[in-house]
Amino acid sequence: MKKRYIACVAAIVVGIILVSWGTAHKGIKPVTWDRTTNRLVVLKKVRHTTKLADFDRLVVNTKLPVVVKPGSVNQVTVQQQAANRRRHPVTTKVHDGTLTVSGGDQRQRGVTLNGLAITGDDEAFDTDGAITITVPQSDQLKVLTLQKSWTVRLEDLTVQRVTGRTGGNFQAKNVQFKKALDLSQGDADIYLTNVTAPKVTAKTSYGDIQVRQSQFKSTANVLNSLDGDITLEMTELGGGDLRTSDGDITVRDNQVAKTLTVQSYEGDLSGMVPATAGVSVQGSTDSDIELFGRSRGATARVRPHAKVQYRFITGDDGDITVR
């Protein structure tokens, strides 16, 4: 009890000191211990913008979130907390038409005070960290290479191809990919909205995959997540394979030219398909299967000779609902 009392008193004293320090530096603001300078510093955002030479290839080698979008000129804007900028500076270099963005880290170690709250965390995050890259609307990226990436978002662009390993999050909105979109390496959540590509291959171990309002003409498209959920909505595609182990899969209001296979070993499957499409379902004796409003057994099939076919397959623990 005595030790606990001493610890509480010590924490209160430290809190009072930190509050006083923060108040003396322009009011009560979040502060952290900067291990670079070994002193308390006020957490504040800093931003700097650099104009760039022309480039048509981009290498992302940073754990800070990166957004690539159209602008009037080639430039990069980096925003970080001041302490993190000193510890993890971001570098940008254009060489032979390739822009490489390196450095930067969201991690910040130390004690943080926000008001009267004191937190200590070896893996806290610089939530202000971000990198924004703009390219002229008339230009297109030939190659986007992901080396050490965490969050990458593409907006309103034309990109020939993507290579490398996805990190925590990959997003593309209003993007045309000239070549097959290969996102088969990594553990990222993948979000594609209004994306066009000849083919998409998206694979992730733990992330979710969401594809909406997009177009992929290939009949061999692949969306595959080991533990995440998969959603495919309002998308035009030749066909393909959607597969997950533990996650759920939802397909709704898509235009499929040939065959779409939807399979989960332990998750639930939900589909909204055209009234003229053929549908086959395969579950287990423990599965609840509903096909166009009617309860079915472990296997069922309607319109087997239709041009467009949907195949729903689930394992012992999964249910299937098709409307």
Q: How would you name each of these model-derived features?
A:
Residues 1-3:
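N-terminal Lys/Arg-rich, disordered targeting/topogenic segments
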Residues 5-24:
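Hydrophobic membrane-insertion alpha-helices, especially the h-region
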Residues 27-106, 110, 126-147, 151-165, ...:
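Short linear S-[DN]-x-LW-Φ motif typified by the pepsin-like aspartic protease active-site region
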Residues 62-64, 72, 82, 103-105, ...:
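A mature extracytoplasmic/lumenal domain signature
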Residues 94-96, 185, 204, 264:
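Generic beta-strand structural signal
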Residues 112-124, 294-302:
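Acidic/polar low-complexity surface segments
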Residues 143-145, 151, 160-163, 169, ...:
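Glycine- and aspartate-rich repeat motifs characteristic of hemolysin/RTX-like Ca2+-binding segments
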Residues 192-194, 198-204, 208-323:
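Short, surface-exposed interaction patches in beta-rich subdomains
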